Amino acid sequence: IEDVAESIAAHLRESAVVLHCAGARGPEELRACARHGAATGVMHPLISFPSSTASPSLRGGTFTVGGSPRAVRAARRIARACGARSTLGITTSPAYHAAAALLANGAASLAFSSVTILRSLGFEPRSAERAMAGLLRSVADNVEQLGVPQALTGPIARGDSETVALHRSALRRIGRPLLEAYDALGPVILQCAQAAGLDDERAEAIKRAFRSRK
């Protein structure tokens, strides 16, 4: 970003607004443009871009914006023109970008694991992918409508340790990496369940199910 900023800075008018879209970098990356009078800022899309040649729909998405007041105003106008929302946030923190990556990259990777399980059971690849995509959309709807942690569903959310044990036994037979992924997520899901009101007794039963070697 800094190299590009250096290359264009001398060609900018003082009325220019320059924005970059990197979520883990702040507006200081554009300091060369700022020195030439441009308003600088960040406009990071909380939208997944899986391809460098095809742009996803921006409508309904959210941009996190930051920078000088003039740059922020311009970024908000661009977001509205795209049919998207904008929110003023701390875009200079790698932790902010980690939050976005954890969800976007984690969801895609978990979909890969889930599709792998379904394919081992005889699902056609595209049928499995469409099924998991529909499930992901329903989760997104629940997060938007109910918020977190209320959007959490499933056996850990209701303290069903017997079903957790059945899941682990089945995954152990399919492949240890899948069981390891399930076990790694267990404490995170349990933390969410407890925030939603799962009582201590059932939480302990869930922990025992994860410790079991069966």
Predicted regions: what is each one?
Residues 1-54:
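Rossmann-like NAD(P)(H) cofactor-binding subdomain of soluble oxidoreductases
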Residues 198-214:
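Short, basic/aromatic-enriched C-terminal tail that caps enzymatic domains
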Residues 141-202:
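Interdomain hinge/lid region at the active-site interface
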Residues 33, 39, 54-145:
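Internal alpha-helical scaffold of NAD(P)-dependent oxidoreductase catalytic cores
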Residues 131-135, 184-188, 206-209:
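Short acidic/histidine-centered micro-motifs embedded in hydrophobic/aromatic stretches
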Residues 1, 26-27, 72-75, 99-100, ...:
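A general structural signal for well-ordered alpha-helical segments in protein cores
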Residues 125-132, 178-182, 203-204:
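Acidic/histidine metal-binding catalytic segments
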